[in-house]
Every structure is written in C-alpha cells, then in structure tokens.
Amino acid sequence: MLQPHLVIGSAFTFGDAFFTLFAFAILLVLIRIYAWKPLMGVMKEREEHIGSEIDAAEESRAQAEQLLAEQKSVLQQARVESQTMIENAKQLGEKEREEIVKTARRESERIKEEAKSDIAREKEDAISALREQVGSLSVLIASKVIEKNLDEKEQSNLIQDYIERLGDDK
C-alpha cells in the first residue's frame, strides 16, 4: 500500500522546503570552500597561461615581421648596390672602349703622317738624285759634245745612250 506522505506532490510542507533549502545552502558553502576556490584558481592559472602564450606568440610574430622587413630592406639594398655596380662596370667599359678607339685613331694618324713624311722625303731624295744625275749627265754630254762636233742625230743618239746606261746603273 501506498502511504500518502510518500507520494510525490501529495503534500507540501514548509519544513521539507526549509530543510531542502538549508541542505542546498550548506552544499553551496561546501562547494564554494572546497571546490569553487580551487576550481577558480585552476581557471585563473589556465587563463594566465593562455594569456602568456598569446603574448609570446604576438611577440614572436612581431619579431618575425621585423626580421622580414629587415630582410626585405637588405635585399632591396643589395639589388640597388648590384644595379649600381653593373652600371659602373658598363660606364667603365664604355670609357675604356672610347679610350682604346682614341688611341688607335691617334696611332693610325701618326703612322699615316710618318708614311706621308717618308714618301715626301723619298720623293725629295729621288728628285735630288735625279737632278744630280741629270746635272752630271748634262756635263758629260756637254763635254762629249765639245770633244766631238756632233750633228743633231749623233747628239740625240749620245743622249739616248747615256740615259740607257743610267737606267742600267740603278
């Protein structure tokens, strides 16, 4: 058989409610003393640990960004320096090429002037030698003409003979 006070919802009494509230309050106090504070301590530790990990990660990221910026700067500077070196080398090569061309032109002009000078000197020497030979030939012919009283034909033959001998001497 069922007893009426054991059936749920059969009767509401303030004593039962008060006892339930009192037991609940004691349970809350015990939970707060023995479980809540240690649980909150663990939670606080966890929060601080996570916060320090986040700070460390942000610091690492900031350092990485700074290093990346520095590396980009160094790379850009290296590019600029290499470009400058290339330009300097091109300019130096161009100057050397121009200097070589100028030197070659001066040398060719000098050789050309020497050749002209040699040609002129040889020409003068040849003319001088020819004048001497013509002069001595004229004297020789004149002496032969004086020795022999020649007519025009003999005189022409004599001149031709001396000219041929002169050509053979060379």
Curated annotation (Swiss-Prot):
Domain of life: Bacteria
Claim: Hydrolase is one of the keywords in the record: no
Spans traversing the lipid bilayer: 11-31
Compartments where found: Cell membrane
Entry keyword annotation includes Repressor: no
InterPro entries with a match to the protein in the record: ATP_synth_B-like_membr_sf, ATP_synth_b/b'su_bac/chlpt, ATP_synth_F0_bsu_bac, ATP_synthase_B_chain
A GO molecular function held by the record: proton-transporting ATP synthase activity, rotational mechanism
This protein's UniProt keywords: ATP synthesis, Cell membrane, CF(0), Hydrogen ion transport, Ion transport, Membrane, Transmembrane, Transmembrane helix, Transport
One GO cellular component term noted in the UniProt record for this chain: proton-transporting ATP synthase complex
Similarity-based family: Belongs to the ATPase B chain family.
Subunit-structure text: F-type ATPases have 2 components, F(1) - the catalytic core - and F(0) - the membrane proton channel. F(1) has five subunits: alpha(3), beta(3), gamma(1), delta(1), epsilon(1). F(0) has three main subunits: a(1), b(2) and c(10-14). The alpha and beta chains form an alternating ring which encloses part of the gamma chain. F(1) is attached to F(0) by a central stalk formed by the gamma and epsilon chains, while a peripheral stalk is formed by the delta and b chains.
Function comment: F(1)F(0) ATP synthase produces ATP from ADP in the presence of a proton or sodium gradient. F-type ATPases consist of two structural domains, F(1) containing the extramembraneous catalytic core and F(0) containing the membrane proton channel, linked together by a central stalk and a peripheral stalk. During catalysis, ATP synthesis in the catalytic domain of F(1) is coupled via a rotary mechanism of the central stalk subunits to proton translocation.
Protein name: ATP synthase subunit b
Organism this protein belongs to: Listeria monocytogenes serotype 4b (strain F2365)
